[in-house]
Regions:
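Extended, well-ordered alpha-helical scaffold segments
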Residues: 104-116, 160-177
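Solvent-exposed loop and edge beta-strand segments that line ligand/cofactor-binding
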Residues: 128-144, 197-212
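Low-complexity, Ser/Thr/Pro/Gly-enriched N-terminal "stalk/linker" regions
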Residues: 97-139, 183-185, 189-190
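Recognizes extended acidic, P/S/T-rich segments that occur
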Residues: 36-72, 82-88
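Pro/Thr/Ser/Gly-rich low-complexity, intrinsically disordered linker/stalk tracts
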Residues: 1-34, 69, 82-99
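Well-ordered alpha-helical scaffold segments within catalytic/enzyme domains
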Residues: 99-101, 145-160, 175, 214-216
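Extended ligand-binding groove/face enriched in aromatic
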Residues: 175-216
């Protein structure tokens, strides 16, 4: 995609990337904070139609459905108010694989891996409990166990490099060695930023043998 982030006074997307899956397309770009973008997709006639308006740096188009044959689409990501006919610089073509068992397995594995790479806590490497936790940046030990397995599979399949997997695993092991434990067991949750145990309630200390089993 384009590496330019301004045209006149209009802030535009850059470093546009896209990946096609059997039932959707994942679009990503480098975002200019505060910008709004219109997502266009061309039909068979070559005309572009608006599919969404978003703020941020990614969009998933689930409107393509599935098909037994591979397909391709062209997208344009335009700043609000920017004419689509003049937006060829913000265009990207993407191939959609047929909905085979192999393609669906790739999709599931890649999206599972993304949770444990893109959404891993940056300092500890542990898996976050969820994206909307009102209690802060809470990480989970049981979920991290699933994440460690996903990292190994992702590296083996070439979705990430071995060095990327090792970086996250190294952070995780370093945190788990030093954090508070309970007769050898880890807590269910920790505050990723402070490293302190996050308990279920004031009546327990946070230690969790089940989550420890999932982790190890």
């Amino acid at each position: 995609g384009s590496s330019t982030d301004t045209i006149g006074r209009v802030r535009v997307p850059y470093h546009i990337a896209a990946e096609g899956y059997p039932a959707h397309v994942h679009l990503k770009w480098a975002d200019n904070v505060g910008s709004t973008y219109n997502i266009y997709r061309s039909d068979e006639s070559g005309k572009f139609r608006t599919y969404a308006q978003v703020s941020g740096n990614e969009y998933m188009d689930f409107s393509i459905g599935t098909a037994e044959e591979s397909r391709n689409y062209t997208y344009r990501i335009c700043p609000e108010g920017f004419p689509v006919d003049s937006a060829s610089a913000f265009e990207i073509k993407v191939d959609i694989p047929a909905a085979t068992d192999s393609a669906l397995l790739d999709m599931v594995q890649k999206y599972t891996l993304r949770y444990f790479t893109d959404f891993a806590h940056p300092q500890t490497g542990l898996a976050r409990e969820r994206s909307n936790d009102i209690n802060g940046d809470i990480v989970t030990t049981g979920g991290t166990g699933f994440g460690l397995m996903s990292l190994i599979v992702g590296a083996e399949r070439g979705f990430i490099t071995r060095e990327q997997a090792l970086d996250i695993i190294g952070k995780t092991v370093a945190f788990l060695e030093d954090c508070e434990k309970f007769h050898g067991a880890w807590a269910h949750w920790y505050d990723g930023d402070s490293g302190r145990t996050f308990s279920f309630s004031k009546y327990d200390n946070g230690g969790d043998i089940v989550e420890t089993a999932f982790l190890v």
